[in-house]
Structure formats: structure tokens, C-alpha cells
Amino acid sequence: MINDDLAMKGCLTIELKGPDGELKDSRDITNVVTGDGKEWVAQRMGKANADIPALMSEMAIGTSTQGPDPTDTALYTERNRQSLSSTTVSADSNEVVYSASFGANQPDAPYAITEAGIFNADSGGVMLCRTKFNAINKGTGDTLNITWTVEAS
């Protein structure tokens, strides 16, 4: 009998910069890989070309204080979603690194950002990971940069 365990985990670095480019806040946070996210990985490995689900392409931020759960399928209070600025696959460490930036007026009002997720569509879609964190107060002129690492081990 084969007995191999494949675990997925993730962590992200969030940096908030003011309109002047000065660093206002920086955090390192862990996340939950969702059940739908794990199913997405399995489908990417085993589906025929026409049925392969879309690649992860978006990151979203929101304002809910609801803790993450593997059964989550969306952010609870999404405020903005942006296309990933980069996706890097590391051959040596079984990691994928996703990056996104939420610039001025993204979202278009000041918010206390408390949650984030990675998705494979610009609306709805499969959520690979979700995290909740203490509030990061993003003003309309601020830029929020998120670098999210997901590892299979």
C-alpha cells in the first residue's frame, strides 16, 4: 500500500506603502488552502486538456473579520480584485509565488483590510487560499502589495 502525504500550505507578505512610497506597514501571515483549492490542484493534474480549470490569475482583498476555514469558497466581504502581477513556479522548492498590487483607488474608498484570497477568475471562480489578519488601514492613495507563497510538501 502506498502511504504518501501531500500537504499544502501558504504564507503571504503584505506591505502597505503611502502615496510617498514610504513603508507604512508590513506583515507575514499564514493562510488556509481551501478544499476547492485542493480539488483545483487535483483537477490540474488529472483532467484532459479541454477540461483543465483556469490558472490562478487574480487576488482579492476584503474587510471581513470571519476566520478562514477550508470550506470557504469566497471572501466574506470582498472590496477589490486585481490581476496577478506575477506567478513564479520554483522547481527546487515545490513553491508557487503569486504577487499582486492594489494601487491608488483600489478600492475606491479607505478600508480596514482584513482578508485576502487567490482566485482563478476576475469574478467568482475557485479560491485557492484565504487568510484573515488584523486590520491594515489602506487609504485611497496607498498601495498594498501582496506576495503569496503556496507550497506542496
Whereabouts are the PLM-identified features?
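Small cysteine-rich, disulfide-bonded extracellular modules of the LU/uPAR three-finger superfamily
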Residues: M1-T114, A121-S153
